[in-house]
A protein has these predicted regions:
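Catalytic-core elements of nucleic-acid end-processing and repair enzymes
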Residues: 1-306
């Protein structure tokens, strides 16, 4: 994995271009795609270094995972009108993710500019102190075989883990998923010992890149895609390293997905993004298209005009 420190927008673009060109020059076998994840700071508190492990929100905190079904059901109970258009559990998780709920999704994007916007943005929480801290852009190579659509059996099964208590989850007996999944995919099939079921048992213990339905305004504006995390027995978290050394390892949860580089984006580069925010089209009102962020943008734009 390569590291670089970026002090300007030009540094970021140049480093990503060089990194992807270098990676393409090597043989990986099969088609690949490149994805980016922007973070405005190390959310675990370290100012200067990126996180070694990238984890979804539901893994952050000792008790969140234990109460995953309660979090899921409370969101539906309190804001049913927000989810009325969502036809699958994955679509519900997508909407929850974009509004800051802890889920088993990790945001990534195929567009570098969106990742840069995430580095600059203060997100849903508006923490101004993050402007004075290093941000990070993680660059991933993803084998095309590790990319799924939101309607696949694998994604349906992994998404419905959010509805089920930890002590009910046993990888060798996934029959408990059948009732939930058949509501979304009538052809969902589970039979002990079948080839399809054996494959699903392996798939549930992996991380997958998922392309969502573009029926969510934030997904549309952000070109948002996701890493969807499965689990082991009793919902024990995956050790998702995204290491290049495990890219071809069928035993690894991150088989076919490698983090090939990390760019450290300094506060100086963040300031330059602020100066060119409209030109780059990476303002918060673009990434988070709602009344609150749009009104804040207008306040900043016109509040100090002389």
């Amino acid at each position: 994995m390569k590291y670089a420190e970026c002090h300007s927008v030009a540094d970021i673009v140049r480093e990503v271009f060089d990194l992807v060109q270098w990676d393409r020059s090597r043989s990986h076998g099969g088609r690949v795609a490149y994805y980016f994840r922007g973070e405005n700071a190390n959310h675990e508190g370290g100012d200067d270094v990126p996180r070694d492990l990238l984890t979804p929100g539901i893994y952050r905190g000792d008790s969140l995972l234990k109460f995953e079904p309660e979090i899921f059901n409370e969101a539906l109970r309190v804001f049913p009108e927000e989810f009325v258009r969502d036809r699958t559990t994955f679509e519900i998780l997508t909407r929850m993710q974009h509004y800051g709920y802890p889920t088993r999704l990790l945001d990534v994007t195929s567009k570098l500019m969106t990742a840069m916007g995430m580095v600059r943005s203060q997100g849903n929480r508006g923490d101004e102190t993050r402007k004075r801290r290093n941000g990070f852009i993680h660059v991933f190579r993803v084998n095309a075989d590790r990319i799924k659509y939101g309607t696949s059996d694998t994604v349906t099964a992994l998404s419905n883990l959010a509805r089920i208590k930890s002590d009910h989850v046993t990888i060798e007996d996934l029959q408990y998923l059948t009732a939930e999944c058949k509501n979304e995919r009538a052809g969902f099939f589970w039979e002990k010992g079948s080839q399809t079921t054996d494959a699903l048992e392996r798939d549930v213990q992996k991380v997958w890149c998922v392309r969502p339905m573009v029926n969510n305004i934030r997904v549309n504006f952000q070109a948002g895609e996701f890493f969807l995390f499965g689990c082991h027995d009793l919902k024990k978290p995956l050790q998702a390293t995204f290491a290049e050394s495990e890219y071809d390892d069928s035993r690894s949860p991150t088989e076919g997905i490698a983090r090939i580089g990390i760019l450290t984006v300094t506060p100086r580069a963040k300031e330059e993004m602020d100066d060119f925010v409209e030109c780059l089209d990476i303002g918060d009102e673009r990434l988070y298209p709602d009344f609150a962020h749009h009104s804040e943008m207008l306040r900043e734009r016109f509040g100090n005009v002389r």
